[in-house]
Amino acid sequence: MVWVIGLMMVLMLATAIAALVLDNLIGATVAAASVSLGVSVLFVLLRAPDVALTEAAVGAGLAAFLLALALKRLGLWRIEVQQKEEDGRAD
Amino acid sequence: MLTRAGPLLFAGGFAFLLFVLLAELPFGDPVMAVGRVVLDEAAATVGAANIVTSVVLAYRGIDTMGELAILFAAATAAGLVLGHPGKADQAEEAGGFILRAGADLLFPLLIVVGMYIILHGHLTPGGGFQGGVVLATAFVLPVLARPGQVPSHGALAIVEGLAGAVFIATGAAALAYDHEFLTPLLSPGRLGALVSAGTLPILYLAVGLKVGAELAGLLIRFTEADAESPR
């Protein structure tokens, strides 16, 4: 049990830092969602399965969905390869 | 320099406040006595195997109605900001093969899981809010895969309105029997059976359909808005 908590802490810290550091905004969105997944595992270990379910559905699912839609609306929904191609076409 | 100092000062003060509060409380010792009473009483009086549900719908039913009202107001405000629905003719091209195949596979699965979570809300963890979110994602995923085929906003609004009306009507029915508003009616039944806990499953079904229709409408409007808005 303790090592699961430790693993989740490391995973959450790593994904949280990745969400800040990553240049690829799609990757950052996924990283931000996986922080919520770690939190929901911790909630299960703390015997709060209801809260864990909410966290997984809203934090990991709906929030990631909203972030992705916002990225799409701002025109930032692309991977670097596509971006270079588009830049090349513009020249 | 000064702009940085403000938030830092606030964060420091907040941490100090939390520290003072926590230093006074004995660790792991609940201050409130209500929780113990609810744990002892809820299973016998309400009949829901999931104690959380009996708190959310039976002891704190009006809180849940307030939550629904807040969610409704937020969805309405977001819909106002995001603008006009429709205009599917200028839709962007369909998603890639993986997205289309994944949406087809996941749609029935998500519907079943969402309905299961809603209908077993009084027995197992979960309930209307969580299941409603799952239902909403089930209906938005196909829209992402095929932007042309959008479920009608009118149908979603009708489902949402009916579900909200059922919630309030179930609460008001208690008034007819000289109980307080939203008091669970019918007999609690056998603890752990699917048909048990009186009217709580009806309330949770209403909550789930309302939340699902509301969030689905909101997210679909979000996907439509990006097609028409200028960058």
Predicted features along the sequence, with ranges:
Chain B
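A structural-propensity feature for long, helix-poor, extended segments
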Residues: L156-L186
